Every structure is written in structure tokens, then in C-alpha cells.
Design a protein with these regions (language model features):
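N-terminal loops that bind phosphate or other acidic moieties
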Residues: 1-541
Length: 541
């Protein structure tokens, strides 16, 4: 897979320079390229305890992106997933440590322990006050003698950084860091491994599987599970965390490992706060990307019980744009809809034949969901199938509340339902269509003529005509042929839909933004949906 890099050798130095040049002057680096890559606060005066962290790169924004007032004083950057050298760590200590001393915060990996530990020993020999804490929050492998340090490291940065910024002594800052480390538990999950720049991707995790407990360098976890959904993913992680949690109030960090969309992270957040540990969670950090694994399609959950002091330190401000702040978890606030926009309530009536026909139409659309999405992905945003299938499910769910025995009112009611439940332009257009069908039907028009009135209204407002590569290209000929029966309408709809694959310039709809190459040979998904509907009805008659 291609990546936005120049060459593998300069990845870290170029990334560090990009970070510094866009920091507004808040950051600087030591003059030691390429072997020494140390990011420091540009305003640091050595009057307080310094906090230094670091390790291999690839976990951004950790650690260089967490340098700033209220968190780290300096970050020592190694190459991707490789510990920095002893000299690089020592240079950071010497550059930022004053009379108050410094605290090294490292993750529990052999290279980091050795290199930071030796640098600390050398600095102490030179007369500097240096303490070191090791984060080991990973609970994925419970029998491991030396658990890994992962996203919980960020909590240590924030709490220790806030206390240091408030003027805490080295011993006080070290103690609060140790307390947080002792209480923090983290577990991760991913649908995929990460892609190390310049290297082939490890395809260890098969499609349909999710790995629980993998590391932030792509190290294998302890278990592969069948992927079901977000709820089950959270449940699997909570099952590991819950036995280790006390009854105290906790902070939770919901961390994006780099490749999960914001939309998905919000769904995971909802599942997390509603999980079996939800009542123990008082504060949340995230969802946010804080300790990543380059582009890993995964996330981690860190929990830690809180004292009043720790809570205050977590909530204290810090001058970092990447920090999402620590917020209270609150019930969802719901505001009443304005008058006129409350959910539609109809006068329901029963008509078994009509109910069967509507259900059949909806089921045809639901069955076509995957095919329509795949077709739409070639010339649009890939959601046509989900849109029409979702509308179909909503109509089925609302069926008992519809005026099934009064067709003019039924058409209008379907239009109102679609305007509320069906998104996108297709939802609006179909709402217009059925509302107009209802109007024409109430004025005595036959069903076919009412449908044609609906099409005319939809075209007048939407602006699409025959040949513009939209659903109109299938719907218009189908309605013209409907007097001759459903089979004739289905044939006409299919011919119209197939013809859209030869139309290389779309004049309406999202396809207007797509070039000819992508349109060539591909049927418009809206027209395909219409053809599928008439074909399905014809086959079942």
C-alpha cells in the first residue's frame, strides 16, 4: 500500500520538522540530526521538574506531540518502532533539567528500559537529579512477567505533567506517576495490523476476525475472535477489564490506534459508556488518537481509579491542541422537536393485501442492499443500498400505524415517513414523489396516473430528465408501460436502467461529479433500484 512519505530513511526527521514548523513557535529541537531527534518546549526555563518521555516513533502524537506546558518537557524520538540511543536520551536530560530535576517516563520495552536507564545513570553521575518510572499497563497477557506499556502512558504524562507544572517536587511528581501506573489497566483490539512505512503489511488478521490484546507495534495478541459488531467488541474488552476494577470512580481513555474513523470511535464510545462498567466511569478522555500504532484499525481502552488529587490534575488545562480534555460522562440531553416536526401520527387502518404488497416492495429493496451499495461505490459514495434498505425497514416497522385502507392518505403518509427516515437526496425525492401521488390520488386520479403525477413533481423539483442518468431513466419508461402489466413495466425499467451504463455524462445526482471512465459500463444505482423493484414485483405476481 502506498504511503505519503518521501523515503524510509528520513521519515522521522521530516515528521519532527513538520510538527515543529506547525507548532506556532511552541516547540524546538536539539541540533543533533539525524541520530539525535529530541523535541523540547521552546519556552522552557528549567525552573520546575522536567518530564521526559519517548521511544520508537510511529505512535504519534505520542510522544513528541505531547510536549507542551502541562505535559512533557521533552520527547526523545527513535526511528519507527525502535528505541532512541543512550546519547539521544542523555542529550534531552542535559538540555532540559535544572535544579529541580527530571522524571523519565518510559514504556516497558527492553530497549527503552536499557537506553533510558543507562542515560539516567550517566546523568546522575554528572550531578543531575533524575528519577525514572516504567509504565506497564497492558493486561492482554496476564502471565507475562513484564507487561507492555501502551496507551496508559498518556495518563501518566498528563497527571505528572500537571503536578510538575504546579510546582511539585521531583519526589512528589514521581510518586503520583507511580500511583497512576499501579492503577492503570489497558487492553487493545484491532481488525488489522499496522503498516510500517517502507515495509510490506502483515496480513495476520483475516477478514471477519478481530484480534484482542495486540501491541502497539503490531505484536500478536492473545486471542482472535469472530468479528460481530461494535457492541460485542466492547464487551470482549470489558470482560477483561472489569475483574481488575475496584468500585471507585474511574477515568477511561478511549484511544484510537490510528486507523479507525471518527464515526466508528463515537459508536464505540457509546457502547463503552453503556457497558457493564459504565457506572464506574466518571471521566472520559477521548475518543482520540493519543498513542497510535501508525494506521492500525483498532482502539484501546485504559481505565484507572481516581483520587480527588488525580482528578483535579487530569482536569487541569494544558497547552496542547491534540489533548481532548478530560470530561464528565453525562446522560444524553434531549431537546423537544420544534412544533410541526414531531414524528408523524396517522390514523391507522388495516388492509391485508396492501400490507402484503408494501412489505414485498420493502423486502425487495432490503435484499438488494449489498448489490446497490457495490454499484454506487463505482460512481458515488456507496450508500444507495443502505439508504433504500433502511427506508424499507422503517416502512415495515411503521406498517401497523399506516392508513392501509385509504390509499390516497397512505401515499401521503409514506411520503411523510420517508421525509423523516430516509436520508440523502433520494429520500427527499421519494418523499416528494409519494406526497404528489397522494395529492393526485385524492383528486380522483387512477393509481398509474397518480404515479405519473408523482414523477412529474419529482422531476420539476429535482431537475432530472430522461437521459440524465438517474432513477428517472428507469421509472419513467416503467410507468409508461404499466398499463400493459407489471411484466411490461419490469422490462421497460430494466432497459432504462441498463441504458444508463452507456450515458457517460451525468446531468443530475452525485454522478455529475464523476468522470466518464468511472461511469462507463456501470448502471446508475437509483435506476437499478427501480428496475429491481419492478422485476421483483413481476416475478411474484
Amino acid at each position: 500500500m502506498s504511503q505519503f512519505i518521501n523515503n524510509k530513511e528520513n521519515i522521522v526527521t521530516e515528521a519532527v520538522d513538520g510538527l515543529i514548523s506547525t507548532s506556532g513557535g511552541a516547540l524546538a529541537r536539539l541540533d543533533g540530526y539525524p541520530h539525535i531527534k529530541v523535541v523540547v518546549r521552546n519556552d522552557w526555563d528549567k525552573s520546575k521538574v522536567a518530564l521526559i518521555s519517548g521511544g520508537g516513533s510511529g505512535h504519534e502524537p505520542a510522544h513528541a506531540g505531547l510536549v507542551g506546558e502541562g505535559m512533557l518537557t521533552a520527547a526523545v524520538c527513535g526511528e519507527v518502532f525502535a528505541s532512541p540511543s543512550v546519547d539521544a536520551v542523555l542529550s534531552a536530560i542535559l538540555a532540559v533539567t535544572g535544579s529541580e530535576g527530571c522524571l523519565l517516563i518510559i514504556k516497558n520495552y527492553t530497549g527503552d528500559r536499557l537506553n533510558f536507564g543507562l542515560a539516567a545513570a550517566r546523568a546522575i553521575e554528572m550531578g543531575f537529579k533524575v528519577n525514572m518510572v516504567i509504565v506497564d499497563d497492558d493486561i492482554a497477557l496476564p502471565d507475562l512477567a513484564k507487561p507492555r506499556g501502551i496507551a496508559g502512558t498518556v495518563l501518566v504524562h498528563k497527571i505528572a505533567g500537571a503536578l510538575a507544572n504546579d510546582g511539585g517536587s521531583l519526589d512528589e511528581v514521581t510518586k503520583v506517576a507511580e500511583n497512576i501506573i499501579a492503577g492503570t489497566k489497558t487492553i487493545g483490539m484491532s481488525l488489522d495490523t499496522c503498516t510500517v512505512p517502507g515495509s510490506p503489511k502483515d496480513q495476520r488478521i483475516e477478514d471477519g476476525k478481530v484480534e484482542l490484546g495486540l501491541g502497539i507495534h503490531g505484536e500478536p495478541g492473545f486471542e482472535k475472535l469472530d468479528y460481530i459488531d461494535a457492541k460485542q467488541s466492547i464487551a470482549a474488552m470489558v470482560n477483561k477489564l472489569e475483574p481488575l476494577m475496584s468500585n471507585e470512580s474511574h477515568v477511561v481513555l478511549l484511544n484510537n490506534l490510528g486507523g479507525v474513523s471518527i464515526l466508528e470511535m463515537s459508536i464505540l464510545a457509546n457502547e463503552l459508556v453503556n457497558s457493564s462498567i459504565g457506572k464506574k466511569l466518571k471521566l472520559i478522555i477521548g475518543p482520540a488518537s493519543l498513542m497510535t500504532a501508525i494506521d492500525m484499525r483498532g482502539f484501546s481502552i485504559s481505565v484507572c481509579p481516581l483520587t480527588a488529587q488525580q482528578e483535579a490534575l487530569l482536569k487541569s488545562p494544558c497547552a496542547l491542541s491534540v489533548w481532548p480534555d478530560c470530561k464528565e460522562i453525562t446522560p444524553i440531553a434531549i431537546v423537544d422537536l420544534p412544533d410541526g416536526l414531531t414524528p408523524v401520527r396517522h390514523n391507522p387502518s388495516k388492509h391485508d393485501e396492501t400490507a402484503t404488497l408494501i412489505t414485498q416492495c420493502c423486502e425487495i429493496m432490503i435484499a438488494a442492499e449489498a448489490d446497490l451499495n457495490a454499484l454506487d461505490a463505482k460512481s458515488g459514495d456507496g450508500d444507495t443500498g443502505s439508504t433504500v434498505a433502511g427506508a424499507g425497514r422503517s416502512i415495515i416497522a411503521a406498517l401497523e400505524g399506516l392508513p392501509l385502507a385509504d390509499h390516497p392518505k397512505l401515499f401521503s403518509a409514506i411520503g411523510q415517513e420517508l421525509s423523516q427516515v430516509m436520508g440523502g437526496s433520494s429520500g427527499v425525492l421519494l418523499a416528494i414523489f409519494f406526497t404528489a401521488v397522494g395529492d393526485a390520488s385524492s383528486n380522483g386520479a387512477s393509481v398509474i396516473d397518480a404515479f405519473k403525477s408523482g414523477l412529474n413533481r419529482m422531476q420539476a423539483i429535482g431537475g432530472a430528465n430522461l437521459g440524465d442518468r438517474t432513477m428517472v431513466d428507469a421509472l419513467s419508461p416503467a410507468l409508461d408501460a404499466l398499463d400493459n402489466g407489471l411484466e411490461a413495466a419490469a422490462i421497460a425499467a430494466r432497459e432504462g436502467a441498463n441504458h444508463t451504463s452507456t450515458i457517460l455524462v451525468a446531468k443530475a445526482g452525485r454522478s455529475t461529479y464523476v468522470n466518464e471512465e468511472q461511469l462507463k459500463g456501470n448502471i446508475d444505482p437509483g435506476a437499478e433500484a427501480v428496475a429491481r423493484l419492478f422485476e421483483g414485483l413481476s416475478e411474484n405476481r
